[in-house]
Amino acid sequence: MGLKRFKPVTPGRRFMVISDFSDITKTEPEKSLLAPLKKTGGRNHHGRITVRHRGGGHKRRYRIIDFKRYDKAGIPAKVLAIEYDPNRSARIALLLYADGEKRYILAPKGIKVGDTLMSGSDAEIKPGNALPLEKIPVGTLVHNVEFTPGKGGQIARAAGTYCQIMAKEGDYALLRMPSGELRKVHIKCYATVGVVGNEDHKNEVHGKAGRVRWLGRRPHVRGVAMNPVDHPHGGGEGRGKGHHPTSPWGLPTKGYKTRRGKRPSDKFIVRRRNEV
């Protein structure tokens, strides 16, 4: 996968940097693995905005991804295609299992069409294979890591991300998260070996506001540009805030910790991401 730059023939093209999509081998998705996807516009079931700056964008269909893999333990799977997924930054790989079933997984870096992948405790340590953490050597880079055994991968699923197994002690493995946090995860949890593919995603530049709108993101309006009824920074003559910077709901911003204290999972965090 590479990046594509453009001649500045228009203002929107001048700084645009996008994927060249050379890693994509199949343009039409597998119909049996599609599901309808309704737009929410950032609203919850009460109709209230819970996530700002969402709405519009191109219509999408959801690709059903297998984040678990353990129920196919010991069954080899052949990579049929690498596909684009509009719902995530990573590419997805279409697998054909020896029992005839097709499934999508996150496409790890380095896999190609024709490769054979496996899952289960006896699988080889190579990119794309899924194993319990207890079977993966210390120092290995992994992605799609479970937090709870059997729940499916939740961590390190975005393009180019990974966790590193730092140590193992008793029933837990110590993992360095993509954020830098050191965290204990149960050794029965599954993880996929390797790094998530499409690692150049972070270097893409949209080039113009319209491309961001196609992705379903609306403008992010500054608080000082609003009226007093809309934001604590709003109103007044000129651009002054008048007080310490706050969120739209009045909480201090710029460094104020909002994480709820005394969470049950705190005992699994060995070092927070912002500690040196």
Curated annotation (Swiss-Prot):
The keyword Manganese does not apply. Residues 230-240, 263-276 have a biased composition (Basic and acidic residues). InterPro entries: NA-bd_OB-fold (IPR012340), Rib_uL2_dom2 (IPR014722), Ribosomal_uL2 (IPR002171), Ribosomal_uL2_bac/org-type (IPR005880), Ribosomal_uL2_C (IPR022669), Ribosomal_uL2_CS (IPR022671), Ribosomal_uL2_dom3 (IPR014726), Ribosomal_uL2_RNA-bd_dom (IPR022666). Transmembrane segments: none annotated. One of its GO terms (cellular component) is large ribosomal subunit. Pfam families: Ribosomal_L2, Ribosomal_L2_C. Disulfide bonds: none annotated. Belongs to the universal ribosomal protein uL2 family. This is Large ribosomal subunit protein uL2. It comes from Thermotoga neapolitana (strain ATCC 49049 / DSM 4359 / NBRC 107923 / NS-E). The gene is rplB.
